Design a protein with these regions (language model features):
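Active-site helical microenvironments for divalent-metal-assisted chemistry
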Residues: 1-138
Length: 138
């Protein structure tokens, strides 16, 4: 099985039964990011970008699936550490050009407030946080 196909299958399984903040099927988010990427490495990392944070998958288990060290380094960079503030996380993402590109696309997708039918105050606060991060990464 090709690595991109394998990555999509893992992402679909990892995000099974998950919904985004707009109530949509979550897997659509990483798929949208994947479609914005240029190289296969970028596409694989984009579709897997939330798998380590949001499922039982780890960088080590993804390594056993045969993903390249480049993809794994991007995924590690895109995974927020337990004791890390959001701002520290964004500063770390800046150091990896591929992770930076994916995180910018992630933030842009997450800032599409029109997907939420009736945005609440918490949605607007989250949007402000994402916008600050987007500006820091641009």
């Amino acid at each position: 099985m090709a690595n991109l196909d394998k990555a999509i299958l893992i992402a679909v399984r990892a995000h099974q039964n998950q919904q985004d903040k707009a109530g949509q099927t979550y897997i659509l988010h990483p798929l949208r990011l994947m479609l914005k990427m240029d190289s296969e490495t970028e596409m694989i990392a984009a579709v897997l970008h939330d798998v380590v944070e949001d499922s039982i998958w780890t960088v080590a288990t993804l390594r056993k699936q045969g993903f390249s060290e480049e993809v794994l380094a991007v995924l590690d960079c895109l995974t927020r550490r337990e004791q890390e503030t959001y701002d520290e996380f964004i500063e770390r993402v800046k150091l990896n050009p591929t992770a930076r590109k994916i995180k910018i696309a992630d933030l842009e997708d997450n800032m599409a407030i029109k997907r939420i039918s009736k945005p609440a105050e918490k949605d607007w606060e989250r949007l402000k946080k994402y916008h600050r991060a987007w500006l820091a990464l641009r």
